[in-house]
Amino acid sequence: MNAPLGGIWLWLPLLLTWLTPEVNSSWWYMRATGGSSRVMCDNVPGLVSSQRQLCHRHPDVMRAISQGVAEWTAECQYQFRQHRWNCNTLDRDHSLFGRVLLRSSRESAFVYAISSAGVVFAITRACSQGEVKSCSCDPKKMGSAKDSKGIFDWGGCSDNIDYGIKFARAFVDAKERKGKDARALMNLHNNRAGRKAVKRFLKQECKCHGVSGSCTLRTCWLAMADFRKTGDYLWRKYNGAIQVVMNQDGTGFTVANERFKKPTKNDLVYFENSPDYCIRDREAGSLGTAGRVCNLTSRGMDSCEVMCCGRGYDTSHVTRMTKCGCKFHWCCAVRCQDCLEALDVHTCKAPKNADWTTPT
């Protein structure tokens, strides 16, 4: 009996992953719906009851989240710009990314983390700009305080990131909290990692007051860093993401390979290896790399060898208008000429198999 039971436990993590329902964050589709909050709340498919309640109760927050979707998707596309999968979105798909994120891959881990971070960033910024009725600047940052440079007064408007994190947790995590499967736990972990990433780059900014800028008095406030810092940080976490399996009681993770460290709350986790994204694959949700621009001189992921998966590339000769002969004129302008520049553009060849054009 021991051998069969041991075999069952060995396969259990894989079974939990395979039996995972098709989890996706339908709130991502808020970017496409737009319009009034009522229209948005009623027409975004797949929202759970608590999400719809928050949506109707806080229309101003929903507007911020909706506007933020474009921001974090753009950041995702920036980070993946030189990779085979480039975080492409599908406007007519309510999951925004299609089937590609149904796989519990490291790409899914990154998207859930960056989207959760994007919600925190968008809500917190809207609070500071006075666009949300239920929050404002951080009320805890008042009076005097002390740092390594001495005593200062809290002033200005400190970003109320705790409100942003609290609302993001309630709204973004709602759907995953209803599930007890492996994918839901993975999403919750990566959502939290994304929220923590934004707070990691909260920085103190100060203004000096005194004769000739002597800084006799200082007024300080806390401000979020540019979202690019969060994106760069999560990109590093993506490259160091840890593959995990469910533990035997189904309540948490353990590393898939004992040589790797146990993931912290800041790490991204994933279950399944990624496809190679070389060819268009309906089931995997991959658009392939045919027609993608590649870099002939690079040795990285954007090189023609890697990007084109060994299929080769086509070269076209193009001309483009560019600025040239720029000169500085006192004071204070830079004047340039318009010049035509000839260059070679290299694009990946399509697979020889004609089935690659099958639409996803």
Curated annotation (Swiss-Prot):
Q: Which GO terms describe its biological process?
A: atrial cardiac muscle tissue morphogenesis; canonical Wnt signaling pathway; cardiac epithelial to mesenchymal transition; cardiac muscle cell proliferation; cell fate commitment; cell proliferation in midbrain; cell-cell signaling; cellular response to transforming growth factor beta stimulus
Extract one GO cellular component term from the record: cytoplasm
What residues are glycosylation sites in this protein? 295
Signal peptide (from-to)? 1-25
Localization: Secreted, Extracellular space, Extracellular matrix; Secreted
Please list the GO terms describing molecular function: cytokine activity; frizzled binding
Name of the protein in question: Protein Wnt-2
The root-end lineage is: Eukaryota, Metazoa, Chordata, Craniata, Vertebrata
